[in-house]
Regions:
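Chymotrypsin/trypsin-fold serine protease catalytic domain
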Residues: 84, 92, 97, 109-189, ...
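A conserved glycine-rich beta-strand in the N-terminal activation segment of trypsin-fold
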Residues: 39-58, 89, 107
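Secretory targeting and sorting signals
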Residues: 1-22
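Conserved H-D interstitial segment of serine endopeptidase catalytic domains
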Residues: 42-43, 61-64, 69-102, 169
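Active-site region of chymotrypsin-like
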Residues: 34-49, 120-125, 160-199, 206-225
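Cleaved targeting-peptide boundary
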Residues: 22-28
Length: 249
């Protein structure tokens, strides 16, 4: 894993300075066309967005490990049940943080973490997918930067969405682990997750509802700009046993 990759991983979890605006797209995406009550915006104690997550149970949120590593519960303020990053829904409190033991600052493997909330929230959680393979149609959602260069613009207030798909792992060249990660396409060669989207959900349609298949992790290459190649997502399918163990009553 190169030093540049680790720097990019860290940058994905920082707020892009500037006032939030309703700019269209994740990068190349659009405003959410439906409620995604399970999508969680993660804010610092001062209220700034730094990552996202997905509500998988009334008291549990899954996010990226690099969003939670080194933080205390008081450092994270989750807002649930709304497509608006700044209002609506319910602001929860974090009681505990569980970072996957495979993750450390020198290696992006195991980029998944769990946040235990102090009390159940009203928003409906999302179920976990049981399979993921190249060719699977997916959707990514988030409040991250909508232009590809770091600090090139403000963040959207409205949740963004982008339809994409899982592709062959050979298209992700930045330390990709095919046993525990998903390589996800950048449609048109210029759209995908960006700074501020880290930890957010990659979802798959299952009938009339959605299932969580991945967690936004990092770029699939070493480029300093977003969406110039497919992106890497932590596979929720691969970590389902770990999630079940840590969240059991």
């Amino acid at each position: 894993v190169t030093r540049r990759l680790l720097v990019l991983l860290a940058l994905l979890a920082v707020l892009v300075p500037g006032t939030a605006t309703a700019a269209p797209g994740i990068v190349g995406g659009a405003n959410a066309d439906q409620p995604y009550p399970f999508t969680v915006s993660l804010h610092s104690a001062s209220g700034k967005l730094f990552c996202a997550g997905a509500l998988i149970a009334p008291t549990w949120v899954v996010t990226a490990a690099h969003c939670a590593f080194g933080k205390t519960p008081a450092d994270i303020s989750p807002r649930t049940g709304t497509n608006d990053v700044a209002q609506g829904g319910e602001v929860a409190q974090v009681a505990g943080i569980v970072v996957n033991p495979a993750f450390n600052t020198q290696n992006p493997a195991g980029d998944i973490a769990l946040l235990r909330l102090t009390a159940p929230v009203a928003a409906a959680p999302i179920g976990l997918a049981t399979a993921a393979s190249p060719g699977t149609a997916t959707r990514i959602v988030g409040w991250g930067q909508t232009c590809p260069k770091l600090n090139c613009g403000g963040l959207p207030t409205t949740l963004q969405q982008l339809d994409t798909k899982i592709v062959e792992g050979t298209r992700c060249t930045a330390g990709f682990d095919g046993t525990a990660e998903l390589c996800t396409d950048n449609p048109g060669g210029k759209s995908g997750a960006c700074f501020g989207d880290s930890g957010g959900p990659e979802i798959v349609r299952d009938g009339d509802h959605w299932l969580l298949v991945g967690v936004t992790s990092r770029p699939g290459n070493n480029a300093p700009e977003c969406a110039t190649a497919p992106s890497i997502y932590t596979s929720v399918v691969a970590y389902a046993p770990w999630i079940a163990e840590k969240t059991k009553a």
